[in-house]
Regions:
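Short amphipathic alpha-helix adjacent to the substrate-entry channel of hydrolases
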Residues: 73-91
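Alpha/beta-hydrolase active-site loop
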Residues: 107-126
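Mobile cap/lid helix-loop segments that gate and shape the active-site cleft of serine hydrolases
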Residues: 71, 164-198, 204
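Short beta-strand/loop motif that positions the catalytic acidic residue
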Residues: 202, 208-210, 214
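Active-site glycine-rich loops that stabilize anionic/oxyanionic intermediates
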Residues: 56, 63-68
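N-terminal cap/lid segment of alpha/beta-hydrolase-fold proteins
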Residues: 17-53
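Conserved alpha/beta-hydrolase "acid-adjacent" motif
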Residues: 215-221
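Alpha/beta-hydrolase fold nucleophile elbow
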Residues: 129-140
Length: 229
């Protein structure tokens, strides 16, 4: 359920690296990069602050598969759009295996979820963040993890899922492109996750976006999710 990129839009604003402890004074209207400790290692994230005093709702952005050493940087344009157009703060996290995040990737989704949850826990402490109003946006690979977050953050008020896969068993059976990624050890009957059984318990509104002619991840995945809501 990956989407391959050759190009991505560069973020409009200048980005600077800051220690997390100084982000309480991050400049308004800008994006700051920070590294935080998680899962016995370190991970990279970007935080965009809107103009004004706040506190601001927080949009959590989870990126898709990228080529080269790019992670959360690939969704900074979207992060800055949320900040400038909607006055939402935006947190973009480089998932394990991407960007400067050093947490080793793996097939267990908890590895990625723990990194994201640790980043969110840190950012919620900032005085200009409204910790009671969280939103999550996930694209492709990121949409899968965004869907998993829906029941793991009580403060989520809305979810946007773009071009994701939500029943990995169906993806595995129907698309040979993803078999080596979903089953790297070559197990005969791999146990893969389906998010669909838990969807009925989601409490926040959900927007599902998917291209009808997507040749990598079938629009059937979006339809299955929609029918389960």
């Amino acid at each position: 359920f990956t989407v391959f990129y050759v190009f991505y839009l560069a973020a409009c604003n200048f980005t600077r690296t800051m220690p997390f402890k100084t982000l309480g004074d991050a400049y308004a209207g800008g994006t700051s990069r920070f590294v935080f400790q998680t899962s016995g290692s370190s991970a990279e994230a970007y935080l965009t602050r809107p103009a004004g005093l706040g506190p601001f709702p927080l949009m959590i952005l989870l990126h898709g598969h990228t080529l080269g050493p790019i992670g959360a940087e690939s969704v900074l344009s979207e992060a800055e759009a949320f900040a400038s157009d909607l006055c939402y703060a935006a947190l973009a996290v480089s998932l394990p295996g991407y960007g400067a995040t050093e947490v080793p990737p793996g097939t267990d989704p908890k590895i990625t979820l723990n990194v994201v949850l640790d980043a969110v826990s840190l950012v919620k402490r900032l005085p200009w963040i409204d910790s009671r109003r969280l939103y999550v946006y996930g694209f492709s690979r990121g949409a899968f993890f965004a869907a998993l977050l829906a029941n793991r953050l009580e403060e989520i008020e809305g979810t946007v899922l773009h071009s994701g896969a939500y029943d990995l068993n169906r993806v595995y059976q129907g698309n040979i492109w993803f078999r080596s990624m979903l089953n790297p050890t070559g197990e005969k009957n791999p146990k893969l996750i389906s998010i669909l059984p838990e969807v009925a318990t989601w409490h926040a509104p959900t927007l599902i976006l998917h291209g009808e002619e997507d040749f990598l991840v079938s629009v059937q995945q979006a339809n299955l999710l929609s029918e389960s809501l």
